[in-house]
C-alpha cells in the first residue's frame, strides 16, 4: 500500500493518478473533505481506502499498524500563503509532518514530502537548497522551512528514504477547489469563459515565476521514490517566465479576449515573490534528467483538460 496525504488535493491527486498509470491502485488517500468539492479530484482515480486526516494523525501518534506500506507521499498541508494563523499553520504543516516522519523512520518506510519555494522568501537569485539562501516571507513559508531544517538534522542517521521537494509555481488539472490560491492560468481561463477580458496585476510583465506543470511534479515524485534518493530538492523547471507568458498562452488557446491590468493589492506588497527560478543543479546531479514543459506547452495541455472537464 502507498499512503498519499492530501490525496484529494491538487498535487496529491495528481500523484495518485501517476501511481494508477504505473498500475498501482492500492492507495490510501488521507485528506480533510470538509470542502466537499475536492471529492471531484478522486472520481476518475483508483484508490483502495480513504481516511480522514484527524483519524489518520491519531492512528500515527498511537503507532497503529497499517500493514505493509511501500511509501508515504506527504502532500497534506495548509498551502495558503495568505493564512496568518501561525498556530494553525505550525500544527498543520510542522507538527503533523514530524509525527508522520518519525512513524516512517521507525518502520523504514520511504517518506516523500512537499516543501515549497516559499522557503526562499523575496530573493531574486540563488534559489539553492542551502540555509544561507532561505528567508521566508510568511508563516506558511516558515512552517515549510522549519520542517526542512528538522529533516536536514535527521538525514545523516536516517536508514530509509526521506525526500523533500520545494515546489515552485505549480499549475494544472485538479486545482479548481483552491479558489484564490489556484493558478493564474485557471483564473484567466475562467475570466474568458465568463465573457470578461483576462486580468493581471499592474507590473505583471516584470513579475517572473518558475511555473511547473503538475504532471511534471508527479513524475519527479515517482522517479525519486523508485530510485530511493534522499535529500531536499527544488522542483521547478529552471526557467522563470512572466505572468504575461501565461496570459499569452491562455489568449492563444481561446483566440479571443484582451489583457487588462488591475492595481496591485496593498495587502500583498512586501509579501509577494516577484521572481522565482529553481536552481536544478542538485536535482540533475541526483540523476533526474527528464525535461519540463514550458508555460506555452503546459498551459495548452491544461486548458484542453480544463475546458473539457468543467
UniProtKB/Swiss-Prot annotation:
Cofactor annotation remark: Binds 1 NADP(+) per subunit.
InterPro entries per UniProt: Epimerase_deHydtase, Heptose_epim, NAD(P)-bd_dom_sf
GO biological process: ADP-L-glycero-beta-D-manno-heptose biosynthetic process; carbohydrate metabolic process
UniProt: substrate binding residues: 169, 180, 187, 201-204, 209, 272
Molecular function as annotated in GO: ADP-glyceromanno-heptose 6-epimerase activity; NADP binding
Record's keyword annotation contains Ligase: no
Necessary cofactors: NADP(+)
Keyword annotations: Carbohydrate metabolism, Isomerase, NADP
Reaction it catalyzes: ADP-D-glycero-beta-D-manno-heptose = ADP-L-glycero-beta-D-manno-heptose
Enzyme Commission number: 5.1.3.20
Pfam families membership: Epimerase
Domain of life: Bacteria
Family the entry assigns: Belongs to the NAD(P)-dependent epimerase/dehydratase family. HldD subfamily.
PANTHER family recorded: ADP-L-GLYCERO-D-MANNO-HEPTOSE-6-EPIMERASE (PTHR43103:SF3), NUCLEOSIDE-DIPHOSPHATE-SUGAR EPIMERASE (PTHR43103)
Quaternary structure and partners: Homopentamer.
Function: Catalyzes the interconversion between ADP-D-glycero-beta-D-manno-heptose and ADP-L-glycero-beta-D-manno-heptose via an epimerization at carbon 6 of the heptose.
Name of the featured protein: ADP-L-glycero-D-manno-heptose-6-epimerase
Biological classification of the source: Bacteria, Pseudomonadati, Pseudomonadota, Gammaproteobacteria, Enterobacterales
